[in-house]
Regions:
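Non-catalytic, mostly N-terminal accessory regions of nucleic-acid modification and defense proteins
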Residues: 1-201, 268-277, 385-388, 410-418, ...
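Helical mechanochemical/support elements of P-loop NTPase systems and associated helical scaffolds
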Residues: 6, 13, 25-26, 143, ...
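Conserved, well-folded catalytic cores of nucleic-acid-processing
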Residues: 16, 150, 154, 171, ...
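A structure-centric signal for secondary-structure junctions around beta-strands
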Residues: 30, 165, 210, 240, ...
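Conserved S-adenosyl-L-methionine
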Residues: 184-304, 309-311, 320-324, 337, ...
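A conserved structural/catalytic subdomain of Rossmann-like adenosyl-cofactor enzymes
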Residues: 279-280, 284-289, 293-480
Length: 480
């Protein structure tokens, strides 16, 4: 069975098993158990590489302080034999739902202090949700047993297995997103959009030996991971990439951490925060003393797909360094607030790619002022109009905006990619050839490609009152 077949089998079974539980909720349970299996298998693999045999594994207990300390220092956590995923499977009909509760409580207690930020509370959503898997203890036990048996064959114990595990994780998230309605946008950027953004960012960073990348609305973490994987192809050493992620919703924040760890990214290269990106500016400060430890971090690339046109609180932010040079986004539409946060956190030679509703190109008022300032500061590098219905849960027309700080030219490349797609159920989907055409146009920056791309001068933009719906390029706006 190949990875596609295994992923499809797991999805079909999981979709039947979830019964009346919302797809958006059920994903947290199955993905949480996948992560626990990953950590459990990883610990067993490390033990066997250090002379532990199956015969001695039952001796793996909390009471053995020396072993506990050694495992925690090397793996980042400790799981006793009785709490291993493989032990749950071997129990057969003796397995009980309470075994999971006990195991998750023990895991939280036995995290290595140095890895607290990566693992602390990572199973909180799973722990609180166990009760929803059945009205009685027996019903919960059956539901959990079915779940762990469903995922027991996913290979997770070797470098080559990260690809299979990652594929299945992404496949499940994508399918849950397709079934989650409007809530899908909270945690998932379609893989093809991630790939497009990744190719643009990786091309910009291709000559760097070490990079830092940041997603301030990280969702499941898939966008950040795709950027890292694409950049690593140029760099050769993926361990020289540091990942920063911030996410407001706790359950989604936990998905970010799980996804990063399961892709084989070193815990020391993962820095995450559960918080509101538009309130306290992060990165970077220590949670116990935000004011005195505030030291803004500037990274090589910021990538984001923030919630579209959501309300925010601009009060008392006029002098905030993220916004002071450009202006404050209106209270009812935070799109430009997210964009300015992203732009602030790149180095002078960095790059931003952000997904936005196309209204940011022409709306007036405070947004018009910010757009004028971005153009006058020469920050807008490119605008890519995407096909309609490309995101789960919304038909809002969207763009990718590419921004930089130290551009050599003052033109803006506008690409109308709204016509290049294939139908995929209710949604539209970018094909590999569509992604290649867009990326090639971005790299080559042609003066004009008929009905697809044009380099627009700053003079023309100013003549157009700083609106970026430039006819006849912007077919995706329904103009011209």
């Amino acid at each position: 069975m190949n990875k596609q077949q295994l992923a499809s089998k797991i999805w079909e079974s999981a979709n039947k098993m979830r019964s009346k539980i919302e797809a958006n909720e059920y994903k947290d349970y199955i993905l949480g158990f996948m992560f626990y299996k990953f950590l459990s298998d990883k610990e067993v693999k490390w033990l066997k590489e250090n002379d532990w045999t199956d015969e001695y594994l039952p001796d793996l207990t909390e009471d053995d302080a020396e072993t506990l300390d050694t495992v925690r220092k090397n793996v980042g956590y400790f799981i006793a034999y009785e709490n291993l995923f493989s032990t749950w499977i071997s129990k057969g009909s003796d397995f009980k739902a309470d075994d999971v509760t006990v195991a998750l409580q023990a895991f939280s207690r036995l995290i290595d202090p140095h890895h607290k930020k990566v693992f602390d509370g990572v199973f909180a959503t799973l722990q609180t949700g166990l009760s929803k898997l059945g009205e009685s203890s027996g019903a919960r036990t059956k539901a959990i047993r079915d779940l762990i048996y469903l995922i027991k064959d996913i290979p997770m114990d070797g470098k080559q297995d990260y690809d299979v595990l990652g594929f299945i994780y992404e496949y499940l998230i994508s399918n849950f997103a397709a079934n989650a309605g409007k809530k899908a946008g909270e945690f998932y950027t379609p893989h093809e959009v991630s790939l497009l953004m990744s190719e643009i960012v990786a091309y910009h960073l291709k000559d760097r030996e070490e990079i830092k990348i940041y997603d301030p609305t990280s969702g499941s973490g898939s966008l950040l991971i795709n950027i890292g994987q694409c950049a690593a192809r140029y760099m050769g050493n993926g361990n020289n990439i540091k990942y920063y992620a911030q996410e407001l919703k706790e359950n989604t924040y936990n998905l970010t951490r799980m996804n990063l760890v399961m892709r084989g990214i070193l815990p020391d290269n993962i820095v995450t925060r559960n918080g509101d990106t538009l309130e306290e500016d992060w990165p970077y400060f220590e949670e116990n003393d935000p004011v005195n430890t505030y030291d803004p971090l500037f990274v090589d690339a910021v990538v984001s797909n923030p919630p579209y046109s959501q309300a925010w609180n601009p009060n008392d932010k006029e002098n905030n360094p993220r916004f002071s040079d450009y202006g404050l986004a209106p209270k009812g539409k935070a799109d430009y607030a997210f964009l300015l946060h992203d732009l602030y956190h790149i180095r002078n030679d960095g790059i931003v790619t952000i997904v936005l509703p196309h209204g940011v190109l022409f709306r007036g008022g405070e947004e018009g002022t910010i757009r004028k300032n971005l153009i006058d500061h020469n920050n807008i590098d490119a605008i890519i109009g995407l096909p309609a219905n490309i995101f789960f849960g919304t038909g809002i027309p969207t763009i990718i905006m590419v921004l930089r700080k130290n551009k050599k030219d003052s033109d803006v490349l506008i690409i109308d990619a709204s016509k290049g797609f294939e139908k995929d159920g209710k949604n539209n989907k970018l094909r590999a050839c569509d992604i290649k055409r867009i990326v090639d146009a971005y790299k080559e920056r042609p003066e004009k490609i008929k009905k697809f791309a044009r380099r627009v001068s700053r003079a023309e933009i100013i003549q157009n009152d700083y609106n970026l719906n430039i006819p006849p390029v912007c077919g995706f706006l329904g103009k011209g």
